[in-house]
Amino acid sequence: MNETKEMPIIFNSEMVRAILDGRKTQTRRIVKRQYISHKQELRLCDDGYFYWWMKDAETHQPRRVSCPFGKTGDRLWVRETFQGPFVDYNDSHDLFKNPESYQKPENCIYRADCGQYPSFYDADDNLRQGWRAAIHMPRWASRITLEITDIRVERLNEISEEDAIAEGCYTDDEYGFNAQPRLWPCQKCQGDQTYAAYANGVYYVDCRECDTAKKRFKLLWESIYGFNSFDNKRVWVIEFKIIEKR
């Protein structure tokens, strides 16, 4: 009987908001070992592992490849930028005596809920603390748990319009409410209908006639991984659903 495993996974604040809003049900992460040959591909076999195959071949290499985030049915606990635990002033003495009893998500503050403020501060501005990076979030502070519903491998540039939307990019209808007209011309049609968006790390796009969800995902990807990072590497495509949020 296969045991369900839990693994941590990091999301930035924009993607956390997309998950909580129900707009993000996929994530793509780079496969660490990349073969140069386009004749090779990673396939999922009956034993639940991926193997390198030559295209149209009947056998695979003996070394299996596992997705570092688990398999279908496993769980992911989300790491995000946060601060805490915080308690009322009257409980502060007990916090130092018995800190474990306050180590709960309900005693934490999350940057995804607070915009782009450089630090956390309370309502009276008496307490200011820098945010704690997502990489340092302990398990007890995580408020979101996901279940993996599917894993596959594909080239980054093969993403479809539907999958780009499932990555947390706005749909065309949603995007219209989050865009403002700009004056410079669209690079493709040379019109004056270029729009700017201020969500999910996207700062400029083509005009409505030229824009696609895939282009918005490309800009989102490069805002996270750097300029020219949308270079068609093989990626793990992890689909998930929320099973807990607190």
Predicted features along the sequence, with ranges:
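Secondary-structure transition motif
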Residues: 1-246
